[in-house]
């Protein structure tokens, strides 16, 4: 039995497409499973998916992060996308959100070149100018191709090729990422307009055929939480200052704006991502998978974590019991706020997005709340005729506090009815503000000026 009106609204918001027939006739610790933890360029960190609007066009914004815990100041700074890894963002349309079937795949493939190999210098030969990508002093240069694969028809369409990745933010040699265009200053905070973006990011946003937009490059790690206290089973969160486990680290990220006109009129979609490598025979082998935050880390036991990473959402019935009877419920002595709630979120493991709402509120905008529905952040849904969650688990936005949202859903934040002040791990925001325009993810942190865990 639901405990309050708030819980009823939460359940309706989370389960909307099932309770109200929406479909027509992971934060992560970044070390999700044993094997993939040994393969940084293919190790997925987080997936984001939410409805947005830009230039009068309605989009499904999707993003995939890889390469966890990039230390901004390490030298030589050689973090990059791997030429031998295939990065896929997968979309399930309509009824496929229930079965987990992939209908469309957006594939990202990279190629690395060096302008000068007769030098000990790797990424940079000096200060990288901010007027064009691959300026003379940018030695490490990555190109990429974006391909749309329609699994329903078999059609393959190249949306863009020879697209360019901006340099990493090393500091003095990449001054235009940083406040005042000074490499000795911290990274630029989030922009509210395209004009306000740093020079390198602006140059790396590419329009593609059919109104797609894409960005690929280094970003700040936008996941925030005291992961150590959770997975050490300490749960004290008693430090006088919040401990953001991902604070001060960067990642690499691909961000794709998908026009809703490309999604076959679906009122709901499900999004997940995979990374794959080719074996000796040339066959593509999946090595990692990411959907909702926390599923692998907090619900799937050790014996099945690697199995999850090489499987598809269509096989997620095998993991249903882990969502129905989570081990953490026994550890904490609690029950989810509603029977079946976690199963609806995680089985199949897709980030489900209601596309009949207005665009999602972005972090920093009026009405945005890090707790999504539990903080009163809801959106009207044409499909349900009511309200649905403004953020995760209806999509996932940059700034959604997925730890606190999950703790509430698990029943570990008390009986309510008001969850709006929930602050389990005392980490309530990212270490740098997000952009309110594409690519939304925050500026990568300066290699010379950054702090960890604050």
Language model: regions and residue ranges:
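Bacterial N-terminal signal peptides that target proteins for export
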Residues: 1-10
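Residues at the start of alpha-helices and the adjacent loop-to-helix junctions
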Residues: 5, 17-19, 41, 434
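C-terminal segment of classical bacterial N-terminal signal peptides
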Residues: 16-26
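Surface-exposed extracytoplasmic segments
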Residues: 26-454
């Amino acid at each position: 039995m639901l405990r309050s009106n708030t819980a009823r609204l939460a359940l309706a918001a989370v389960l909307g497409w099932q309770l109200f027939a929406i479909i027509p006739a992971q934060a992560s610790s970044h070390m999700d499973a044993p094997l993939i933890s040994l393969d940084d360029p293919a190790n997925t960190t987080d997936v984001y998916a939410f409805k947005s609007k830009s230039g009068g066009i309605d989009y499904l914004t999707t993003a995939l992060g890889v390469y966890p815990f990039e230390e901004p100041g390490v030298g030589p700074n050689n973090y990059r996308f791997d030429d031998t890894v295939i990065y896929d963002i997968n979309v399930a349309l309509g009824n496929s959100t229930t079965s987990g079937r992939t209908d469309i795949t957006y594939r990202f493939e990279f190629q690395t070149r060096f302008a000068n190999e007769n030098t000990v210098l790797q990424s940079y030969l000096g200060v990288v100018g901010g007027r064009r990508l691959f300026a003379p002093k940018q030695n490490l240069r990555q190109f990429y191709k974006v391909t749309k694969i329609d699994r329903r028809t078999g059609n393959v369409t190249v949306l863009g090729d020879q697209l360019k990745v901006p340099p990493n933010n090393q500091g003095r040699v990449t001054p235009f990422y940083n406040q005042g265009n000074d490499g000795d200053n911290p990274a630029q905070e989030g922009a509210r307009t395209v004009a306000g973006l740093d020079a390198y990011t602006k140059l790396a946003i590419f329009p593609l055929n059919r109104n797609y937009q894409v960005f690929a490059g280094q970003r700040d790690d936008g996941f925030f939480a005291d992961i150590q206290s959770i997975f050490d089973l300490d749960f004290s969160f008693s430090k006088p200052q919040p401990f953001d486990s991902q604070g001060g680290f960067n990642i690499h990220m691909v961000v794709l704006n998908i026009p809703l006109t490309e999604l076959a009129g679906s009122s709901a979609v499900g999004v997940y991502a995979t990374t794959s490598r080719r074996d000796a025979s040339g066959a593509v082998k999946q090595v990692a998978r990411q959907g909702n935050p926390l599923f692998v880390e907090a619900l799937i036991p050790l014996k099945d974590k690697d199995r999850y990473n090489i499987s598809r959402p269509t096989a997620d019935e095998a993991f249903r019991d882990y969502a129905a009877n989570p081990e953490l419920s026994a550890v904490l002595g609690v029950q989810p706020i509603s029977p079946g709630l976690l199963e609806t979120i995680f089985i199949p493991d897709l980030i489900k997005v209601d596309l009949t709402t207005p665009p999602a509120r972005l972090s920093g905008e009026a009405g945005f709340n890090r707790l999504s529905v539990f903080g009163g952040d809801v959106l009207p849904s044409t499909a349900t005729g009511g309200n649905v969650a403004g953020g995760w688990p209806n999509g996932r936005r940059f700034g959604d506090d997925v730890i606190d949202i999950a703790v509430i859903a698990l029943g570990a934040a008390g009986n309510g009815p008001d969850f709006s002040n929930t602050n389990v791990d005392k980490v309530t925001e990212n270490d740098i503000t997000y952009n309110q325009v594409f690519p939304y993810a925050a500026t990568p942190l300066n290699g010379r000026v950054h702090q960890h865990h604050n």
